[in-house]
Amino acid sequence: MKFAIRDDDTSYFTKPQELEKAFGDLTGIPVSLSVIPNAKSNHGNVFPYGKGPFDREYGNVGDNLELVSYINKGIAKGKYEILMHGIHHEYYRINNDWIPEMMNIDYSEAVTLIKKYRKYLEETFNTKINTFVAPSNMMNKFIFRALDKIGMNTMSVLSKKFDRDISIHYLKYYIKRNINKATKQFDAIGVMKYKNHKELYMYIFKDFESAWKKYNLCKKYNLPFVFYTHYWELNSEPKLKSDLCKLIEMMIADGAKPSLVNECYK
């Protein structure tokens, strides 16, 4: 079976040394970087890049030439690939809650912005980008519709609620999800193929124990195991990094193949 690491939040404000610290010692393990095209310096009330001061409020990732050079070298070596991580990774304060940007956008705006910034990332890193990752893994039905229009894959977990346009594809996976939940106590499906895009389940990496449990469930049902990290958390929490290394070691010993996210859609 395949496993893949999706690491979120690389942006203009990221130093290449931070990515190297998080992943440079993971020899032979590729990492799919979810890159923010034009990042806001803070994410709501979360400050992944510290509290500044910053030289700008919004930063185009391509303006960080040192970072782009580092990532491009990693792409050439098969260490990294680029996924698109929202537009600004911006949050809006609504009724005392922080709402991620992809929950606060309509269809036409989504099509325009996603196409614009996908092209920007592809030109910046000289690579094809096929996968969109929503900040906080949250997006409204207009984003799903836009991604299908554009033909970009994504990662999501099907909800019990009807949270997107009704289609034959969606109903098929919605029913399968609920049957799996009832009979297997595990709602993952694997690759979900819609009209013009595909979707995959993914899991947060919190600790070794919970991740190992999810890995074994994916193995039992012959599904790819894709989990996501944040490089800035790995760098600030030694136990989290230690648990990640332990998980990788155990999965490889178990015969799992380290892969990039885009390889898991195949």
Feature annotation, model-predicted:
Residues Y12-T14, K40-G44, E90-N95, M138-I143, ...:
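Short catalytic/ligand-binding loop motif for oxyanion handling, primarily in non-cytosolic enzymes
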Residues T154-S156, K219-K266:
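C-terminal domain-boundary segment and adjacent tail
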Residues H43-N72, A76, T131-F225:
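Active-site-adjacent pocket scaffolds in enzyme catalytic domains
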Residues K79-Y80, A256:
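Short, conserved active-site loop motifs that form the nucleotide-linked donor/cofactor pocket
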Residues M1-K77, E123, K128, F227:
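Active-site beta->alpha N-cap acidic-glycine motif
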Residues P30, N104-N140, L217-Y228:
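CE4/NodB-like, metal-dependent polysaccharide N-deacetylase domain
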Residues D7-D9, L33-P37, M84-G86, V133-S136, ...:
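A cross-domain feature marking catalytic cores of carbohydrate-active enzymes
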Residues Q17-F23, V68-N72, V111-R118, F144, ...:
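Generic structural signal for well-ordered alpha-helices
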